[in-house]
Amino acid sequence: MSTNLRKTHPLAKIINNSFIDLPSPSNISAWWNFGSLLGACLILQTITGIFLAMHYSPDISLAFSSVAHITRDVQYGWLIRNMHANGASLFFMCIYLHIGRGLYYGSYLYKETWNTGTTLLLLTMATAFVGYVLPWGQMSFWGATVITNLLSAVPYIGNTLVQWIWGGFSVDNATLTRFFAFHFLLPFTIMGLTMVHLLFLHETGSNNPTGLNSNADKIPFHPYFSYKDLLGLILMLALLLTLTLFSPNLLGDPDNFTPANPLSTPPHIKPEWYFLFAYAILRSIPNKLGGVLALMLSILVLFLMPILHTSKQRTTQFRPLTQILFWSLIANLLVLTWIGGQPVENPFITIGQMASILHFSILLILMPIAGMIENKMLT
């Protein structure tokens, strides 16, 4: 009897066990689609990025005009550039939905998968930040200046650290060159860590909406979830192309159409929409070091989620108290995102401070307490 090459060949066997014969819970909903969508985003961003790198010049005298050259003179350069810029926005939409799913359904109890995922988020944020500097527009330059300057809040070594990252006494040619190097390198690091993320996931298998063990009811990944993922991919690409072809600059900043000028500060310095919530938390604390710590903690708090889980049940599906807190957290993050894009004046300052306090209160205090109360209600 001839054996199936798919199951015996050393390389094909890995692919088979990961994407074809993988036993999957039969009841995972569309919320489980975002992992594969993130993989698709990563591939798309890498391909468009490599094509952009072929025509881009990482030099302060050429960067801005090389991006203009790409959009005007390169065959389909406008499409590649706009897909790359809007692909980043879609990437973060998928990341946030993926994390939200993990929080809601208690996926963070797979600690290794969760920790590699949170590290992937940090790497992706770093990649997006250095990438935003590359077109060398006003917001690129001042964004780089403001965010790298935050490191000067580090006691004793702060200023040295900032100058070391800048490669001089201000954001200059050395900074742009190294940011381009990092922007090219980091996605490959992300790919490697994505494989580790999947490796850890396949050690335990996927979680499911009930949070119960699903070993008794598994179905093969292909054809069921491969086609389901394909549908998700088609919908995501439709959204990306709609955004790219009809309103490519909707999510961008008009200031970035002005070449970088160290002598003129834009009226409102703000990052891309996907960083606004963290930027709002940073700005809500009057002390520089305090702001930086709050900014870092707002992301690093994700590492604490497995420790903060107090409930006997895994998912939020059957826990009304935690559900109210979860959706309050989402609403609060939307408020923070809105505040991050507003000028630093009242009432925005006060709203930002209240939303920042609420953000940490829900995650660190209220959710663990709600879990304990629900446990009491069960007994």
UniProtKB/Swiss-Prot annotation:
Keywords: Electron transport, Heme, Iron, Membrane, Metal-binding, Mitochondrion, Mitochondrion inner membrane, Respiratory chain, Transmembrane, Transmembrane helix, Transport, Ubiquinone
Compartments where located: Mitochondrion inner membrane
Binding residues for a ubiquinone: 202
Keyword Zinc-finger (UniProt): no
Residues involved in heme b b566 binding: 98, 197
Gene Ontology terms: biological process: mitochondrial electron transport, ubiquinol to cytochrome c
Cofactor binding comment, as recorded: Binds 2 heme b groups non-covalently.
Recorded superkingdom: Eukaryota
Residues annotated as binding heme b b562: 84, 183
Gene3D superfamilies with a match to the protein in the record: Cytochrome Bc1 Complex, Chain C (1.20.810.10)
Listed GO CC annotations: mitochondrial inner membrane; respiratory chain complex III
Transmembrane segments: 34-54, 78-99, 114-134, 179-199, 227-247, 289-309, 321-341, 348-368
Pfam family of the protein (one): Cytochrome_B
Cofactor names: heme b
Membrane topology: Multi-pass membrane protein
PANTHER family in the record: CYTOCHROME B
Family the entry assigns: Belongs to the cytochrome b family.
Oligomeric form and interacting partners: The cytochrome bc1 complex contains 3 respiratory subunits (MT-CYB, CYC1 and UQCRFS1), 2 core proteins (UQCRC1 and UQCRC2) and probably 6 low-molecular weight proteins.
The protein's name: Cytochrome b
Organism this protein belongs to: Actinemys marmorata (Western pond turtle)
Taxonomic placement: Eukaryota, Metazoa, Chordata, Craniata, Vertebrata
Gene name of the record: MT-CYB
